[in-house]
């Protein structure tokens, strides 16, 4: 049995080698010929699964994507061909939410505002948007939700229309898939018309899919230099990056918001376990058993934590400025976008830090945020 995996999928080679012959290749450059005699294909979001790629897939029975997003896969085509498909919904939700919080903490420090006084506008209330809302609840930060599809489906949460969210939010953070059809397409959801309405004190963050934001329109908006700020982890035509847009961004990173080590381990193990079920095999993987010990110290609190403490804890785990600096330095090199993703450092989640303190420290909000807590 031949299993073709993306070479940049952590832990995949060691796990899938238990089930058959593993072939590792670059996910972005896969061709139809690569799928000849392949039984299973394990990918990430850089691989477009379409008719062209599958044209020589004479034995393919299973496709798994170790990502939460699925818009890179033609699911209708797989169903038509009788090929089983699975994804890893929610695998990266923690990493993306922590990325957003890191960006806001640094911007708050740089520009002298408090995120606790801001209203967040979360566009897309799926796995990632919902987890970010959970984090904001833990910190008692106000937010608005926009997701017309979930609202139509009867989701009991309180939603607002996009125009209201754009008007009332200080921070607009995008967590939608990319869709071009249907009643609520997200392609260029944030285009020239929307951008022209945004205030100069607002912040836009896109850690969803690049084409959700019209990058040319965003560039023109930022060229006004009136205080409006934008953070992009994804780009409309990635791996190509508009080098005129880049210096206008507050932070820019190569599609790594959800690239925490825990998230990647979750994604790989989720599709591994699904493939084992498909094969009726008994093997199962637990992401926690794959993770190395985090090189992050335990933290002891001797008094009630405050906003400054929280800022320090968040930056101890992940400081977006590190990735931003590397991105700006390396992006002009040929192939840099994918290389930075391939060589990405072992970033951890809040859960990798154990915070020790007494009951008087009120550690519950930190626990709800994801930190590991020990009361003494």
Swiss-Prot record:
One of its GO terms (molecular function) is 4-phosphoerythronate dehydrogenase activity. It is found in: Cytoplasm. It is an enzyme of class 1 (oxidoreductase). SUPFAM superfamilies: Formate/glycerate dehydrogenase catalytic domain-like, NAD(P)-binding Rossmann-fold domains. Substrate binds at residues 45, 67, 259. Its EC number is 1.1.1.290. It comes from the Bacteria. GO terms for cellular component: cytosol. Homodimer. This is Erythronate-4-phosphate dehydrogenase. The gene is pdxB.
């Amino acid at each position: 049995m031949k299993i073709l995996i993306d070479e940049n999928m952590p832990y995949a080679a060691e796990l899938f080698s238990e089930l058959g012959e593993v072939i590792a290749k670059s996910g972005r450059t896969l061709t139809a010929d690569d799928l000849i005699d392949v039984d299973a294909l394990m990918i990430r979001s850089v691989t477009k699964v379409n008719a062209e790629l599958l044209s020589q897939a004479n034995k393919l029975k299973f496709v798994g994507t170790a990502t939460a997003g699925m818009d890179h896969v033609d699911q209708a085509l797989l169903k038509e061909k009788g090929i089983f498909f699975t994804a890893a919904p929610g695998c990266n939700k923690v990493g993306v939410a922590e990325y957003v919080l890191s960006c806001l903490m640094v911007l708050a420090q740089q520009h002298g505002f408090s995120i606790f006084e801001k209203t967040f506008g979360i566009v897309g209330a799926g796995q990632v948007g919902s987890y970010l809302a959970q984090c904001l609840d833990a910190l008692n930060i106000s937010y608005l939700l926009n997701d017309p599809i979930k609202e139509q489906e009867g989701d009991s949460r309180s939603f607002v229309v996009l125009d209201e969210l754009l008007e009332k939010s200080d921070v607009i953070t995008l967590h939608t898939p990319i869709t071009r059809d249907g009643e609520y397409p997200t392609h260029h959801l944030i285009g020239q018309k929307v951008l022209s309405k945004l205030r100069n004190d607002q912040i836009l963050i896109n850690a969803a899919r690049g084409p959700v934001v019209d990058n040319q329109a965003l560039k023109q908006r930022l060229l006004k230099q009136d205080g409006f700020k934008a953070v992009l982890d994804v780009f409309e035509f990635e791996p190509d990056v508009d080098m005129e847009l880049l210096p206008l961004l507050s932070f820019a990173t190569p599609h790594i918001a959800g690239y925490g080590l825990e998230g990647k381990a979750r994604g790989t193990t989720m599709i591994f376990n699904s493939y084992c079920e498909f094969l009726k095999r008994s093997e199962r993987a637990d992401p926690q058993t794959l993770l190395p010990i985090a090189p992050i110290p335990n933290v002891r609190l001797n008094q009630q934590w405050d906003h400054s403490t929280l800022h320090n804890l968040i930056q101890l785990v992940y400081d977006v400025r590190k990735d931003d600096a590397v991105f700006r330095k390396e992006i002009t090199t040929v192939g840099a976008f994918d290389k930075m993703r391939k060589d990405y450092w072992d970033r951890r989640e809040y859960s990798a830090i154990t915070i020790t303190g007494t009951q008087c420290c009120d550690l519950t909000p930190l626990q709800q945020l994801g930190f590991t807590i020990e009361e003494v």
